[in-house]
């Protein structure tokens, strides 16, 4: 579960250093997710580093709203890890066209799976209204009940 949160923290550093500026076709591993968020939503991945109960460091309780998509992303990465994928280091190529992430031509099972995880999470973020009140949401307000990954 904490994988998404570590990813978002690393993304914030990458974005701050200008690493999110990508050529049309990119291969970068862990930092894919930040670029995919920007492609799909037009927002900086920093907007989600401490959003709700799952987007950011840690992760517990019940997601606050539809934009608190990181629990589902954590579950997807967990499934990828059971397939032997290295969610922090495996790389894949993708491109952004008209706010759509394209990575359908990948052949490697881990590349395909990780791209799907990142693309689905970014689509979730794109569709959901961004609620400013959940930025910097305190974890003590998240409760102790958590959804199971099987709900997705």
Curated annotation (Swiss-Prot):
Q: What GO molecular function terms would the record report?
A: calcium ion binding; calcium-dependent phospholipase A2 activity; phospholipid binding; toxin activity
> Which positions carry the signal peptide feature in this UniProt record?
1-20
What does the similarity note say? Answer: Belongs to the phospholipase A2 family.
Q: What does this protein do?
A: PA2 catalyzes the calcium-dependent hydrolysis of the 2-acyl groups in 3-sn-phosphoglycerides.
Subcellular location, in the record's words?
Answer: Secreted
EC numbers: 3.1.1.4
Instruction: Tell me which residues this entry annotates as catalytic.
Output: 73, 118
Does the entry feature the keyword Hydrolase, yes or no? yes
- Catalytic activity reported: a 1,2-diacyl-sn-glycero-3-phosphocholine + H2O = a 1-acyl-sn-glycero-3-phosphocholine + a fatty acid + H(+)
Q: What is the official name of this protein in its record?
A: Phospholipase A2
SUPFAM superfamilies named among the record's database cross-references: Phospholipase A2, PLA2
**InterPro entries per record:** PLipase_A2, PLipase_A2_Asp_AS, PLipase_A2_dom, PLipase_A2_dom_sf, PLipase_A2_His_AS
Tell me a GO cellular component. extracellular region
Q: Which organism is it from?
A: Meiacanthus atrodorsalis (Forktail blenny)
- Report if keyword Lipid metabolism is assigned: yes
Judging by the UniProt lineage, the source's domain of life is Eukaryota
Give the first-level EC class, as a single word.
hydrolase
């Amino acid at each position: 579960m904490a994988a998404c949160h570590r990813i978002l923290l690393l993304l914030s550093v990458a974005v701050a250093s200008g690493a999110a500026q990508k050529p049309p076709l990119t291969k970068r591993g862990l930092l894919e997710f930040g670029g995919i968020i920007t492609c799909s939503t037009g927002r900086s991945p920093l907007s989600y580093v401490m959003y709700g109960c799952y987007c950011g460091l840690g992760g517990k309780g019940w997601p606050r709203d539809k934009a608190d998509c990181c629990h589902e992303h954590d579950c997807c990465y967990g499934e990828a890890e059971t397939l032997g994928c290295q969610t922090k280091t495996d790389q894949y190529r993708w491109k952004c066209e008209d706010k759509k992430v394209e990575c359908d031509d990948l052949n490697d099972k881990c590349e395909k799976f990780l791209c799907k995880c990142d693309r689905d999470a970014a689509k979730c973020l794109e569709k959901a209204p961004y609620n400013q009140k959940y930025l910097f949401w305190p974890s003590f307000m998240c409760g102790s009940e958590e959804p199971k990954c099987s709900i997705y």
